[in-house]
Structure formats: structure tokens, C-alpha cells
Amino acid sequence: MQGSRLIVALDTASWEQALKWVDRLPQVLWWKVGLELFTAVGPQILQALKERGKRIFLDLKLHDIPHTVGRAAQVAVGYGVDLLTVHAAGGSAMLRAAVAATQGSSCRLLAVTLLTSLGPDQVRQELGVERDPGDYVLQLARLALDQGVSGLVCSPQEVGRLRQALGPEVLLVTPGIRLGDPEAEDDQRRVCTPAAALRAGADYLVVGRPITAAADPVSAWQRFQAVEEAIG
């Protein structure tokens, strides 16, 4: 995969707003379409991005019975998306069904380990996982890779450990990126700066509101791009 390592998230339910961002930032190659936008406007947003020559990260985090996930992944492949997500917690059979659906295509399958909105207390108290979140993430990562996925979506806090444990070939995509204060209040808990994530071994960074909600999205993107270029 070539081009910038920044993926900008189209976090909106509005067709008009999504394309306004895309057209205002023509230098951005990679765009993420998540559940909100895909549910609101359907697959035509993918066609609009393809017509503009963009690469597409379809982040639907598929999590269902194996047959359903396999069929959904097959449909996504037909849209020409470049990256597609499934939940690693869906289990080995579900993961294998998704892998089988994407084989022979240019779509690379990514497994989501643990949502960046979940902090250690929630992982323990609500999910009933008494282990360190990093250990849990590594277990899910190995499960997914054993079934044949191409890479992982993981928080910046886990990316260094995963890179060290899993080697250089695994594609690591990291959301939860904040250019300024990583402790700034929002609904993501496990976040950090782009420089730290890239140095830890992330291949791609997913950035949404710090760019799209900025007073000047172009300047905000340029600041992120400058960090990427400085790291190399």
C-alpha cells in the first residue's frame, strides 16, 4: 500500500458533509467510512470516493454468525474497498469466513481487537476480563492472525507491544490519534499523539475529529502530515 499513512475518518451521517470534506481535502488519499455514514447513505458513498480516485477503509466492524459475516464481506469486496474490519472477538469460524470472502481480491481484512473507547476499568468490570488489556489484545490479535487476516486495528497503547510480538509483516492500523493533548476529553480512552504511534510501529493512523472538526481542516491535516514526514 502506497501513499500517506493518514486515514481521515468521515464521521458524519450527511452525504453533503462527507463529500464537502473529501473535496476540501483533495490531497488526502485514504478515507474511512464507518457505520454511521454507511448506514445513513449506503454504498453510494463508496462509489463517490472511488470516482475521486480515493482509497477506502470500510470500518463496519462486522460481528455476527460466520455465514452472515462471510456474505457481508463478499458484498464489501464487490464495492472495491481496500480495507475492511471485523471483530476478532467474533471467533475463529467467523474470522475464517471473512478471510475466505476476501481471498483473491485487493481488499485486506483487519481484525479489531479492543475498542479505543474502552478503558481498563470497563474491560474488567463490564466485559469481565480480569487480565491486563494489553494481554487480552495480544490474545485476540494472535487468534485473528492465525485465521489469516492481514492486519489489526489496535489502540496506540498496544501498537508497540503488538509490533514487537508479531513482527514487521502484520499491518497495524491505529485510531485514537490526537495531535495535541492525548488526555483531552472525548469518548476515546486509549489515545496518543501521531509521533508516538508511528514510532511504536503503526502503519496507518486514523484521524477524524481533530481534522474534520477543526476550524481549518486543511491546516489541521497539514500539521498531521508534517509529523508523518518528520518521522519518515
From Swiss-Prot:
CDD domains with a match to the protein in the record: OMP_decarboxylase_like (cd04725)
Binding locations of substrate: 11, 32, 59-68, 116, 178, 188, 208-209
GO-annotated molecular function: orotidine-5'-phosphate decarboxylase activity
Keyword tags: Decarboxylase, Lyase, Pyrimidine biosynthesis
InterPro entries hit by this protein: Aldolase_TIM (IPR013785), OMPdecase (IPR014732), OMPdecase_AS (IPR018089), OMPdecase_bac (IPR047596), OMPdeCOase_dom (IPR001754), RibuloseP-bd_barrel (IPR011060)
Enzyme Commission code(s) on record: 4.1.1.23
GO biological process: 'de novo' pyrimidine nucleobase biosynthetic process; 'de novo' UMP biosynthetic process
Record-annotated active site: 61
EC class of the enzyme, as a word: lyase
Pfam families: OMPdecase
Reaction(s) this enzyme catalyzes, per UniProt: orotidine 5'-phosphate + H(+) = UMP + CO2
UniProt pathway annotation: Pyrimidine metabolism; UMP biosynthesis via de novo pathway; UMP from orotate: step 2/2
GO CC terms of this entry: cytosol
Keyword rRNA processing (UniProt): no
NCBIfam families reported for this sequence: PRK00230.1, pyrF
Family: Belongs to the OMP decarboxylase family. Type 1 subfamily.
Role of this protein: Catalyzes the decarboxylation of orotidine 5'-monophosphate (OMP) to uridine 5'-monophosphate (UMP).
Assembly and binders: Homodimer.
Name of the protein in its database record: Orotidine 5'-phosphate decarboxylase
Lineage: Bacteria, Bacillati, Cyanobacteriota, Cyanophyceae, Synechococcales
Gene assigned in the entry: pyrF
